[in-house]
């Protein structure tokens, strides 16, 4: 009985994966003056002139800042802080566990 249920779930999963893969791998193609066909998913960017391409890349704001590229620069010099929230007052990964026999902490019982 359990094997039949696993087989049905496996086939159902396979059908869902096949359907979603079929939807993502279909590309609409366009041909440009006998230069061959290319997909419409951003592959035309290299065919544009450099000024237009540069402006589109600058408008996307997906670049590394000059401050991050400086030599010998640590993004956050505060010890124990995350690089992403360096200015906040909280520690990035605070230690919250207590002392126990498992962690081999020294206890003074007297």
Curated annotation (Swiss-Prot):
**One Gene Ontology term from the biological process aspect of the record:** regulation of pollen tube growth
Q: Site annotation (Required for proteolytic cleavage): which residues?
A: 54-55
Q: Which residues form a coiled coil?
A: none
GO cellular-component terms in the record?
apoplast; pollen tube
Q: List the signal peptide residues.
A: 1-23
Task: Cite the GO molecular-function annotations of the record.
Answer: hormone activity
Propeptide stretches in the record: 24-58
Keywords of this entry? Disulfide bond, Hormone, Secreted, Signal
Q: Where in the cell is it found?
A: Secreted
- A Pfam family of the record is RALF
What does the PTM comment state?
Proteolytically cleaved, probably by S1P, a subtilisin-like serine protease (subtilase).
Disulfide topology = 76-86, 99-105
Is RNA-binding included in the keywords of this UniProt record?
no
Q: Report if keyword Cell membrane is assigned.
A: no
Annotated function: Cell signaling peptide that may regulate plant stress, growth, and development. Mediates a rapid alkalinization of extracellular space by mediating a transient increase in the cytoplasmic Ca(2+) concentration leading to a calcium-dependent signaling events through a cell surface receptor and a concomitant activation of some intracellular mitogen-activated protein kinases.
What family does the Swiss-Prot or TrEMBL record give for this protein?
A: Belongs to the plant rapid alkalinization factor (RALF) family.
Tell me the protein's name.
Answer: Protein RALF-like 19
Quick one: which gene encodes this? RALFL19
């Amino acid at each position: 009985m359990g094997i039949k249920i696993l087989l049905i779930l496996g086939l159902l999963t396979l059908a869902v994966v096949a359907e979603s893969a079929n939807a993502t791998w279909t590309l609409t193609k366009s041909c440009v003056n006998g230069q061959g066909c290319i997909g419409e998913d951003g592959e035309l960017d290299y065919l544009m002139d450099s000024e237009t391409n540069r402006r589109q890349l600058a408008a996307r704001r997906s670049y590394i800042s000059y401050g991050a590229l400086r030599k010998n620069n640590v993004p956050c010099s505060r010890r124990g802080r995350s690089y992403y929230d360096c200015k906040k007052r909280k520690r990035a990964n605070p230690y919250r566990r207590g002392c126990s026999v498992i962690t081999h902490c020294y206890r003074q019982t007297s």
